[in-house]
């Protein structure tokens, strides 16, 4: 039976303490469609659930995606990487959530965490589930970046099409992770082949194509640095839209549902106002070619 952590025993201070040094230039990964060494893709044949972690309202941008990818090598210390490599087998998208039961996002859903070890149910597997849940809590509280800077998404997504949009941010151990969703598989292949996002990785998830960018420029969390980071992210999205525009027949129009989505997310994070997935996805047809 997988373990459930109903309440956080302590609040992890993912903003100031236990900061990681900047990544070395020799080992910086770059998002590509090819298989990245050390990056384990999710395989449904051998996955099994090991724990659950309760969400908070600032995780709402990821709850609507119903999955939360993260390459753990980017946020773990050297010793934690050793433990993860030797005793655990964790994929890039080990946290999923199911909100289809009642179609309502309240901000306190439970994220289900799975692993791919060869001994499901063993003591080592259960212990790894507890460790993985504690690591995932850093991401849960790192999502408070979305509540502290709610205008970040407004700046980046202003006038952007639905095919390329910024979804949310996570701040863990002095590192800022920026989540960009590429709506279609073909668009993801075109963009990743023709441009570089720098320190990043690509997640071909169960339901989403996500490019996760790493940033250390805004590690002090001052408004000036964060606004510069937002403008840099917007320039990358604009470049991706330009690349897609040269390979698509129809023009990419700005997303009409994005302003309303921003209002729903801010209402949940700031005033605890729940919303339904029907309201969030209204007016968007994901199967349109």
From Swiss-Prot:
Pfam families: Adeno_E4_34
CC per GO annotation: host cell cytoplasm; host cell nucleus
Cellular localization per UniProt: Host nucleus; Host cytoplasm
Keywords: Early protein, Host cytoplasm, Host nucleus
Principal place of residence: host cell
Xref: InterPro entries: Adenovirus_E4_30/34 (IPR007615)
Superkingdom of this protein's organism: Viruses
Subunit relationships: Interacts with E1B-55k.
Its biological purpose: Plays a major role to prevent cellular inhibition of viral genome replication by nuclear bodies. Assembles an SCF-like E3 ubiquitin ligase complex based on the cellular proteins ELOB, ELOC, CUL5 and RBX1, in cooperation with viral E1B-55K. This viral RING-type ligase ubiquitinates cellular substrates prior to proteasomal degradation: p53/TP53, LIG4, MRE11-RAD50-NBS1 (MRN) complex, ITGA3, DAXX and BLM.
Family designation: Belongs to the adenoviridae E4 30 to 34 kDa protein family.
Protein name from the UniProt record: Early E4 34 kDa protein
